[in-house]
Design a protein with these regions (language model features):
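N-terminus-centered regions that define maturation/targeting leaders and the start
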Residues: 19-143
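Intrinsic low-complexity, intrinsically disordered segments enriched in polar/basic residues
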Residues: 2, 15-16, 26
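Bacterial N-terminal signal peptides that target proteins for export
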Residues: 1-8
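Bacterial N-terminal signal peptides
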Residues: 9-17
Length: 143
């Protein structure tokens, strides 16, 4: 019984260390970016990307890599985009050309969790800062 407990603890450590290392890639010194956004009706399903407000964006930023994830459906790809020669604190609505917005099922009367992940890149493409912002929404929010 004790052996199973130790194996379980080792497995948890490996899982957690994997989560930590994948958040900022290989650049452990990356800073933290604040990420905020609001989903509107026009951002749903295959609409346009929402405006995204960033704080603490490093002055050395030369580009951004942005992706949208659905925490309730990890395999779902909601796209995002790469913004080259970009270092502004506001990503305008519609700027993410690969965006496929959240499209919660009308038959499920619950809320879903969506995360925008933003990586700031320097002139060499190295990640110099990372941030993410989460919102929850359901179909009823957009009727």
């Amino acid at each position: 019984m004790k052996r199973k407990s130790i194996l379980f603890q080792v497995a948890i450590i490996f899982l957690l260390s994997g989560c930590v290392s994948t958040q900022v890639g290989s650049n452990i010194d990356a800073g933290t970016i604040g990420v905020d956004f609001v989903f509107q009706k026009e951002n749903m399903c295959f609409g346009t990307s929402p405006q995204i407000t960033l704080t603490h964006l490093p002055a050395e930023t030369k580009g951004l890599k942005v992706s949208l994830r659905d925490l309730d459906h990890p395999g779902a790809d909601h796209g995002g985009g790469d913004l080259k020669n970009f270092n502004a604190s506001i990503i305008p609505a519609g700027a993410l050309k690969g965006y496929q917005g959240p499209c919660p099922s009308m038959s499920e009367h619950r809320r879903f969790h969506y995360v925008f992940k933003v990586e700031a890149l320097d002139e060499t493409g190295k990640v110099i800062a990372f941030g993410q912002g989460m919102k929850e929404c359901g179909w009823v929010d957009f009727q």
